[in-house]
């Protein structure tokens, strides 16, 4: 009798995706982040669902309802801080996952790569709207500043902003719709994840060498299931350490003050995972230019397959490209730091230089170095 997992219509799909899936024998720990992102999404959906049971999306009661969750609901504080810090861990995994794709040339699977970038945009939008929900000072002013950027769009800008707000300022209508979108988007993300996996399994996984691995495949289970469990345990350890020892480490103290439209905080800044993009936005004095740079800072990832001029797929055997890649990583750390600093000398000029370097490395320096490496190898 044939094994049920190979014949049952539903179990067969799971089998081909997670059990009998042929995987390259040499994929490193950098390939663990896909499963970790799946875990993060599940954690966020479940903690978010339980938070939504107690949260009220009204300007008068939103802040109080979050306080109520933390004080009166059984383990409410745990659910709330797991959700807030879960977002941070989610973004750490996202950045590492994208960085891995850039380093090892995984972007040559361009359907998988482009859906991944759409996923990145969707997660960023979800996180932004989630940050508005507690209705603290930084929630309110963050929402005001970021939505206001759309007013830079010529002709339709102002109308568009008022349409998103549902009025003439960020108010009850804005909070209600942000809650609705924040609730529904993770399920859309989950559907997109399935499409992402569908396209990935059409081609199979890349591997550190960037070479075709068809001649040397091993089953996903037990080898990579065990490897993923190690990653899962480490992720849970990091998340729970953050939640139980310093839950407010990555948050903003201003968000413990209820939203007040009449009092602007001295430094409006988003959560840490948006700071690099925020620094790029602020480094351009023109409003429309800043908005374009902000969008392009992520959208530029879609150009990676077109900018790949090297004869080799991975950076594993390309030391010059490796060097530039790590300079890009250092540049992103610099931008993240600058995004959290006040707009004054010397931070302004450092931010501008770091922003120029970011686009220069991706659009100019990396492709040029790829051509130089081809020449050095007489290809």
Swiss-Prot record:
The keyword Metal-binding applies. Heme b b566 binds at residues 97, 196. It is found in: Mitochondrion inner membrane. It is a multi-pass membrane protein. GO terms for biological process: mitochondrial electron transport, ubiquinol to cytochrome c. A ubiquinone binds at residue 201. GO terms for molecular function: metal ion binding; ubiquinol-cytochrome-c reductase activity. Binds 2 heme b groups non-covalently. One of its GO terms (cellular component) is respiratory chain complex III. Heme b b562 binds at residues 83, 182. CDD domains: cytochrome_b_C (cd00290), Cytochrome_b_N (cd00284). PANTHER family: CYTOCHROME B. This is Cytochrome b. The gene is MT-CYB.
